[in-house]
Each structure stands twice: as structure tokens, then as C-alpha cells.
């Protein structure tokens, strides 16, 4: 509140806040995340709980995350409700795919839920494995071991075109590239496809 951030749109629910635990990796053993979201406020979100028109009244951009659709069918339905309202109100819509397979445990495949939702997005963010999970498009590949690694720009352009073909509304595709050398040594890059 001290910084002028409104809190009147906050919806309270669930039995508790969701938690996650990070077990840091060591050497060649990757980090591990344990999610504890069952019964949490976010996991109990349902359509009709949020007045999206009121929330979006002065907005021009709505950003959503695949995590919102991952916890339950009701959460995915609430996400659809938000997307339809944002679309109707003329907002720019962006999506971070954020596929966390450990969260998808309500019997629906990631692509079956995400593909209809992502159709509302003007901008999409994600890593290669997330695009593979949602769109079933083979990654271009990123095996950098240093900064001299040559990016396959034509391959990434084709990748972006494929996404834009599946999601005609999408004009920008951001792609995170990561090559894990050890648990604490990663090489990162990003590519933007703009239609």
C-alpha cells in the first residue's frame, strides 16, 4: 500500500499458502523442487471468484502463467475466464508457458489444457522443453559450452513461424535457451521471433 499498489482485488481462499522447497544441486546432480500446493489459496481458485472486468478496468496488458492452469481444472477454467475477459476488453495478452510437470496431476495432458488457452496470447515466453510439451514442436537445440557457440538463427526463425502458425494471434515468441554444464554452471541465451 505504501507504494500505491492496490489490494482491493485480492481474493482470499484455501486453507493455506502454497509452498515449494528447493533442494540445491551439487556437482552433476541437478537441483530438485518439491511443490506443496494442494489445498492452497491458489489451488482452490474457481471461475467467478474474481471480477476480471473490474481488475482489468484500467489495464492494457494481461500476463498469465501456465502454472495457473496446472493445479486443477477449475484453475484452468478461471484462467480461461480471465483470458476471455481480457480479450473482450482489448488487452494485450502475454503468456509464460511455465510448464512444471510435477504440478500437472489432475488427469489432463499439458497440451490439452494449454493449447486452447494460449490461443489468446499475443506474446509467448518459454524454454524449448516447454514449447515441446505444449506445441509438440521439436527444439532447435542449444549445446553451447562457451559464448562462441553459433546460434542456428534460421532454425529459430522456422521455430517461431511454426508457433505463429499454431497461434495465429501470436506476434512475438520469446525462447529461453539453456545448456546445463553442472548444477551451478549454466549457459543461457534467448531468442525473439517477431512476426
Whereabouts are the PLM-identified features?
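Conserved N-terminal subdomain of the carbohydrate kinase-like
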Residues: 1-67
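Hydrophobic beta-strand scaffold residues
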Residues: 7, 93-94, 125
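A generic structural signal for short hydrophobic patches within well-formed alpha-helices
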Residues: 41, 69, 100, 131-132
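Active-site glycine-rich loop that binds ribose-phosphate moieties when present
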Residues: 44-51, 77-81, 108-113, 154-158
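Catalytic-core regions built around general acid/base machinery
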Residues: 77-90, 112-120
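Short beta-strand/loop segments at the ligand-binding rim of alpha/beta enzyme cores
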Residues: 89-98, 103
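Conserved phosphate/ATP/ADP-binding segment of small-molecule kinases
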Residues: 103-194
Amino acid at each position: 500500500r505504501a507504494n500505491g499498489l492496490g489490494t482491493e482485488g485480492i481474493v482470499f481462499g484455501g486453507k493455506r499458502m502454497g509452498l515449494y522447497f528447493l533442494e540445491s544441486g551439487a556437482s552433476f546432480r541437478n537441483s530438485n523442487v518439491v511443490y506443496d500446493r494442494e489445498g492452497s489459496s491458489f489451488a482452490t481458485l474457481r471461475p467467478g471468484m474474481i471480477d476480471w472486468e473490474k481488475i482489468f478496468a484500467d489495464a492494457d496488458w494481461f500476463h498469465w502463467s501456465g502454472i495457473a492452469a496446472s493445479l486443477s481444472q477449475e484453475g484452468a477454467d478461471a484462467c480461461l475466464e480471465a483470458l476471455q475477459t481480457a480479450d473482450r476488453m482489448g488487452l494485450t495478452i502475454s503468456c509464460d508457458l511455465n510448464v512444471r510437470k510435477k504440478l500437472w496431476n489432475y488427469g489432463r495432458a499439458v497440451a490439452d489444457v494449454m493449447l486452447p488457452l494460449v490461443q489468446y496470447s499475443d506474446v509467448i515466453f518459454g524454454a524449448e522443453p516447454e514449447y515441446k510439451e505444449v506445441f509438440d514442436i521439436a527444439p532447435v537445440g542449444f549445446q553451447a559450452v562457451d559464448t562462441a557457440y553459433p546460434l542456428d538463427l534460421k532454425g529459430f526463425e522456422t521455430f517461431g513461424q511454426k508457433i505463429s502458425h499454431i497461434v495465429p494471434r501470436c506476434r512475438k515468441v520469446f525462447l529461453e535457451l539453456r545448456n546445463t554444464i553442472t548444477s551451478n554452471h549454466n549457459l543461457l541465451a534467448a531468442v525473439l521471433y517477431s512476426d
